[in-house]
């Protein structure tokens, strides 16, 4: 599957794609194409902001940092708006979602572009600007689990319900996962072999 990752923000982001892709700097208007093998699971695409890297690709980012390297091998540090997917899973379906379980840093659209699959997801609200003060952080809005680390928000025991904080995210981005046990409608499917695009600041 081909993933086209485009930065429509007015500022530079450092896109990340794991486990396939790594990371690149995307200036406003730039795109990056990643070819992802069939069967790839547990995959994420996200934007990093406020980064500084040296010539060898070492440094760090204000949001979404993946261990201080440009070429990500690991997931990013919250807060980061996540495009998550698994390809060719049950019944050869692709499963994809936008998740705010690790908080929000950059608005995002995640949509299929082929195979007759048309239902995409977007999360474009001004979550950073409206973020509750206790969740605010440099460059983003944290999920309460990151801040409070309690079972109520993190669902470590496997069962938990929505909270005022998760509703804050859900009201602004109804198609995105707002907490770990959020409703299944937050996950979307296409037939295997579909191509996708991720747009930052759509």
Curated annotation (Swiss-Prot):
The keyword Ribosomal protein appears for this protein: no
UniProt-listed GO biological process terms: defense response
Alphabetized PANTHER family for the sequence: OS03G0233200 PROTEIN (PTHR31048)
Keyword Nucleus: no
SUPFAM superfamilies referenced in this protein's UniProt entry, alphabetically: Osmotin, thaumatin-like protein
Disulfide bonds: 9-201, 51-61, 66-72, 117-190, 123-173, 131-141, 145-154, 155-160
Annotated keywords: Disulfide bond
Protein name in the entry: Protein P21
Species assigned in the record: Glycine max (Soybean)
Family: Belongs to the thaumatin family.
